[in-house]
Structures are given as structure tokens and as C-alpha cells.
């Protein structure tokens, strides 16, 4: 007796009732365990969330979404056998793989975000602790106009770091108040000046959140560790999970000796990006953001700069 076989219909390949292109079709919030190997160091293990998309032409009802999962898993297996790897390269490879699987698509996008644990030591006692940094990466792949086998790939890497800022404006008000009171007590002017130089005045503080992202072509690499350090240095002080009293003294004194507006933080990040990445091309896209969560206001303060690397170089060199 012959076995009956059935050809299952490919519903996704059928024509839609409304024939329009769709910019993005895919899956979001895909959880994956990612192990990134590093040269001469222990691997980084991340629990990551992926958003994966392709565009859809007007003559297809739907995309083959299972291919998105296949593309991600295939690249993750590749990562395990590669000596050194970067998360933006991971996204780039997934985007490239997606276009190979979705022959009807002209572009693919991959977004990844994760929490990255870094080790810290408190500034005075040296107590070891772990700090969480939010990291993210993106990649896009676009087919060439004349060659469907050529993919133009761009990738992005970035981080968000929490720190502390001290307000310069309120501090100057308190400095003037202290100088007046000391003068009324008969303290000599030169002694007042020396005192104010050594002892930082009170001001209100903010918890700052700095973000830097750098978008480059597929053949350039950007150090995530360098991005994190730049953001940390841009604020009045770093913050720590565990602090003893001597540590608290150092953190508070450091912050109040280095007061900064939200605008100062963005400009400091821009300056350090130019210094830290001299080999980046002029067409690299730099996005810098700073949000300060105010302590004496109900609102937050925000500043941002988006520019090409060449534009920043030109401005800072003037």
C-alpha cells in the first residue's frame, strides 16, 4: 500500500490582501546565553536579549520567523569555537546570516542588550565588589543594489554607566555663604581662600547615567572596556556597591572637588572619545547622552551630542 504524502502550503509565501512593504518583521525579547571568549582572560558569560528583524516585500504575506532563531543559534555555536570575539561582531554575523536565510529580504537588523558584571575595589579600603553595567550592540546588513550576494554591514557598540555628579551652581552659592561667615568671624582673607581651596563646599548631588554608542563599518573594532572607562571618568565621581566610612569620605570629597553640570559630562565624554579612539574613521557615528536624576527637583537634567567622529575631532582641535 502506497503511503500518501502531502505538500504543506507555505502560507508565508502567499500574497497578502494588502500589498505593501514592511520595514521590520521579526522577533523581540529573545533570551540567549552568550559566552564571549577573551585572549588570556576568563570568558564573559552574558544572559542577553535579542531583537531580530528583516524587511518584508509587498508580495509576501509573512516572514519565516523560525529562520531568525536558526540564525542566532548558528552564530552562537560559532562563538564557542572562536578564540576572541566581540558582541558587536556577534550581531554583525547574525545580521549577515539572516540575509542568507531570508532570500526575499533586502536588509536585516539585530539588537542585543545585556548586563555586564565588572569587578571594582572601593577607593580607600580596597573592598572588592561587583558592579553592573548595561551594555548593548546592534548591527544592520543591507544587500548591494547590483549584487544580492554582497552585504553592506554596519555595527554599533555601547554602554550605560551609573555615576555621581555634584552641582556647580549650588556649590558656588554655598562657597560665597561660607566666605561671608568666615569673614564675619574675623578670619583673614588669605586664610579664607586657602580653606575654600582645600575643603569642598556642600551642594546637591545627582545620580548620573552616561551613555556612549559608536557605530562603525564591519571592519573596525571598538573597545567596550574603553567606552565604560570614558563614561565613568566623565562624571564627578564613580559610585560603589560597598563603602566603609573612609571610602565614603573619598567619594564625597572627590565628587565635590569635581562639580559638573550635565552638559560638562557630555563634553568630557566627547573629548575622551576623540583621545581614546584615534584610529576610528571620520564617518563613525558617535552618540553621547547624559541623564542626571535630580535630588532637589522633580525633573531630571539631560544633554546629548550626536556627531560624526570627524566633526568632533575638528571642534575639539580648535
UniProtKB/Swiss-Prot annotation:
Its EC number is 3.5.4.39. GO terms for molecular function: GTP cyclohydrolase I activity; GTP cyclohydrolase IV activity; iron ion binding. Its cofactor is Fe(2+). Gene3D superfamilies: Urate Oxidase. Pathway: Cofactor biosynthesis; 5,6,7,8-tetrahydromethanopterin biosynthesis. The record marks 167 as: May be catalytically important. Keywords: Hydrolase, Iron, Metal-binding. It is an enzyme of class 3 (hydrolase). Pfam families: GCHY-1 (PF02649). It catalyses: GTP + H2O = 7,8-dihydroneopterin 2',3'-cyclic phosphate + formate + diphosphate + H(+). Binds 1 Fe(2+) ion per subunit. InterPro entries: GTP_cyclohydrolase_FolE2/MptA, GTP_cyclohydrolase_MptA. GO terms for biological process: tetrahydromethanopterin biosynthetic process. The keyword Calcium does not apply. NCBIfam families: GTP cyclohydrolase MptA (TIGR00294). Homodimer. Belongs to the GTP cyclohydrolase IV family. Converts GTP to 7,8-dihydro-D-neopterin 2',3'-cyclic phosphate, the first intermediate in the biosynthesis of coenzyme methanopterin. This is GTP cyclohydrolase MptA. It comes from Methanosarcina mazei (strain ATCC BAA-159 / DSM 3647 / Goe1 / Go1 / JCM 11833 / OCM 88).
